[in-house]
């Protein structure tokens, strides 16, 4: 039975884990790291780079290095947060054919789900390399405050990567699962999750293997990227004040600033001061310019103070929805790389009135929880029940543009709810059902998830037809909506797909692209391996001929030189079969030369005087020896 992997698909970094027996193992990638940068780049030759290899070349290839794409997933191009993001990233954000926010690199447009699928493929390959077998099933985590469109887009990314996504699980819930798995006592816990791009807070009740989410809240556009941006802006402003040059207008300089800002932020979690040194950051008529600046922890904290403070609003809302006070929280778990920042730890400690738990790795705990959930779904782990909630209210637009809720936020999922509505006009034969998600009273102020028509309603006075609208939320938090005319039994149903979203055709095309790329990558790897093998064989054969000049027959030497020339000729092209064929021919010639040399050596050895074996009857004399240890003699 194939294994189910747990993947934390993060904004900045991703992580993959697997359940082995009773233990969970976080799997190291090919570079030996336990987390992988969620970055994808396209080189000049259009080679796709993922993870650390993409991050390494980001400074020299800023417009084609895609990072923090998770912030765009499931969002419309005209979303205000997308507009804000356009001014912060070094790559191009463009409008997709469906109106969603897509990204562009080297003239090619990609859906955020597609870019995320490249990262998921890397995590899948990491697990396969460790397990030595194919992996087809996964549990993938998302921020708890992700809406339906973002969840669906994440599931699509898994499908494009060739994974059957058994469950989409909320990141704080996964962290709680990892934390509470071995805990005997129950209690109320708060999971404070501040990652690279998003913030979540969840309140959970733990007890007897039941993990029940009481409430969740958050901000899907608040995380480490915003903290980095504050440092970037500060450094750029200081440099502009001193040199009169705005580094943010130079994409190469901006990428170097971004790397330096992230490094400085991390260093200031353990030290009080750090130096940022970027030689030759730019140049003007007077010559090259260098950026050398000191940044203290106190200055960093003053730059990001309001961002840390912003996390407390959702915390208050989550406590209120759960019906508990901060003092009633038994344990606070910190998740996400940003929670290593002393200012964040201090703020959480002050708000909840207790020291946060330090016995979980904030970078790995989410992937560990996802792996545990995978084992639960497979039946390998028993007596664990996860009860999650929907983060936002769901409803439809009714007369006057009002948002009528059918399912309130923090309702335990899976869930199903129906309500009967009627027509607004006399003789109305069709109704349009507009589905929204959010907390505002007017529908237009909330997120439109999708709409559909129910037609064929018999003409009747307004208010007479009975139209039953049913919302169904599955365990992944993904919504289906149906509308049924009770008189005729006619029904219309849709799986919500954002206002745009990827169609099944789009997903199928992207799956095929991914498969084609996998085949192309395999072919490229085979060609490189064949070239390396051929080069090595040519070098070895030439060395053999040179070292054994005079010992190889003229015929064999001629054949070897002809075979070497054939290999070199094949290496000038890219025909894999031609290289293999020429290499095979050279291998045969080299083996024959080797055999001839060994044979000649054996014959020469046999002919040498003193090499004969003792004839029968010859006197054999035992040698006398001394045992060094025992100082005994024997004859």
Curated annotation (Swiss-Prot):
Indicate, by first and last residue, each region the UniProt record lists as having compositional bias (Low complexity). 601-616
Which keywords does this chain's UniProt record carry? ATP-binding, Chaperone, Nucleotide-binding, Phosphoprotein, Stress response
Region feature Disordered, mapped onto this chain: 601-635
Cited InterPro entries: ATPase_NBD, Chaperone_DnaK, Heat_shock_70_CS, HSP70_C_sf, HSP70_peptide-bd_sf, Hsp_70_fam
In the record, what terms sit under GO molecular function? ATP binding; ATP-dependent protein folding chaperone; unfolded protein binding
Q: Indicate where the modification Phosphothreonine is found in the sequence.
A: 198
Q: What induces or represses this gene?
A: By stress conditions e.g. heat shock.
Q: Which Pfam families match?
A: HSP70
**Superkingdom of this entry's organism?**
Bacteria
Give the record's family classification: Belongs to the heat shock protein 70 family.
User: What does this gene product do?
Assistant: Acts as a chaperone.
This one is known as Chaperone protein DnaK
Q: Which organism is it from?
A: Acidiphilium cryptum (strain JF-5)
């Amino acid at each position: 039975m194939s294994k189910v992997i747990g993947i934390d698909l993060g904004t900045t970094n991703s992580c993959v884990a697997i359940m082995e027996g009773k233990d969970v193992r976080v799997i190291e990638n090919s570079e030996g790291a336990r987390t992988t940068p969620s970055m994808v780049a396209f080189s000049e030759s259009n080679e796709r780079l993922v993870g650390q290899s993409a991050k390494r070349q980001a400074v020299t290839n800023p417009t084609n290095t895609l990072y923090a794409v998770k912030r765009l997933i499931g969002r419309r191009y005209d979303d205000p947060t997308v507009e804000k993001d356009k001014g912060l990233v070094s790559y191009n954000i463009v409008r997709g054919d469906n109106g969603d926010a897509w990204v562009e690199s080297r003239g090619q447009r990609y859906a955020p789900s597609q870019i995320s699928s490249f990262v998921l493929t890397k995590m899948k390959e990491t697990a396969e390399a460790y397990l030595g077998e194919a992996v087809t099933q996964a549990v993938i985590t998302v921020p708890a405050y992700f809406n339906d469109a973002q969840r669906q887009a994440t599931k699509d990314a898994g499908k494009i990567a060739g994974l059957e996504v058994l469950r989409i699980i909320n990141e704080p819930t996964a962290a709680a699962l990892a934390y509470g798995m071995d805990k005997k006592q129950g209690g109320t816990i708060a999971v404070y999750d501040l990652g690279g791009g998003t913030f979540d807070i969840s309140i959970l009740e733990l007890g007897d293997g039941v993990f029940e989410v009481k409430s969740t809240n958050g901000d899907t556009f608040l995380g480490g990227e915003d903290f980095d941006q504050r440092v970037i802006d500060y450094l750029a402003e200081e440099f502009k004040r001193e040199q009169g040059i705005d580094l943010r207008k130079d994409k190469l300089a901006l990428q170097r600033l971004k790397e330096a800002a992230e490094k400085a932020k991390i260093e200031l979690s353990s030290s009080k001061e750090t130096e940022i040194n970027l030689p030759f950051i730019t140049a003007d008529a007077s010559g090259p310019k260098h950026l050398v600046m000191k940044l203290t922890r106190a200055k960093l904290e003053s730059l990001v103070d309001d961002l840390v403070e912003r996390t407390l609003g959702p915390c208050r809302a989550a406590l209120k929805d759960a019906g508990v006070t901060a003092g009633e929280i038994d344990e606070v778990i910190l998740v996400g790389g940003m929670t290593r920042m002393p200012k964040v730890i201090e703020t959480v400690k002050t708000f909840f009135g207790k020291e946060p738990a330090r016995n979980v790795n904030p970078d790995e705990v989410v992937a560990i929880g996802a792996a545990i959930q995978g084992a639960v779904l497979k039946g390998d782990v028993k007596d664990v029940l996860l009860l999650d909630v929907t983060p936002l209210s769901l409803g439809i637009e009714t007369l006057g543009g009002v948002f009528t809720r059918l399912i309130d936020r923090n309702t335990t999922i899976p869930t199903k709810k129906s309500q009967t509505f009627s027509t607004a006009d006399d003789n109305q034969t069709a109704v349009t059902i507009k589905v929204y998600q959010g907390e505002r009273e007017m529908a237009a102020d909330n997120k439109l998830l999708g709409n559909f028509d129910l037609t064929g309603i018999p003409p009747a006075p307004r208010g007479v037809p009975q139209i039953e609208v049913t919302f169904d939320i599955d365990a992944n938090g993904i919504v289906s909506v149906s509308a049924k005319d009770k008189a005729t039994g006619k029904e219309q149903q849709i799986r919500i797909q954002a206002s745009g979203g990827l169609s099944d055709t789009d997903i199928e095309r992207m799956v095929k692209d991914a498969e084609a790329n996998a085949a192309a990558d395999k072919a490229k790897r085979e060609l490189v391996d064949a070239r390396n093998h051929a080069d090595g064989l040519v070098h070895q054969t030439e060395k053999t001929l040179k070292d054994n000049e005079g010992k190889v027959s003229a015929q064999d030497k001629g054949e070897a030189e002809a075979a070497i020339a054939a290999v070199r000729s094949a290496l000038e092209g890219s025909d894999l079969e031609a290289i293999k064929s020429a290499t095979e021919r050279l291998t045969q010639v080299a083996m024959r030369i080797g055999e001839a040399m060994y044979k000649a050596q054996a014959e020469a050895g046999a002919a040498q005087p003193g090499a004969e074996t003792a004839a029968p009857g010859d006197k054999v004399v035992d040698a006398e020896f001394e045992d060094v240890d025992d100082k005994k003699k024997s004859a």
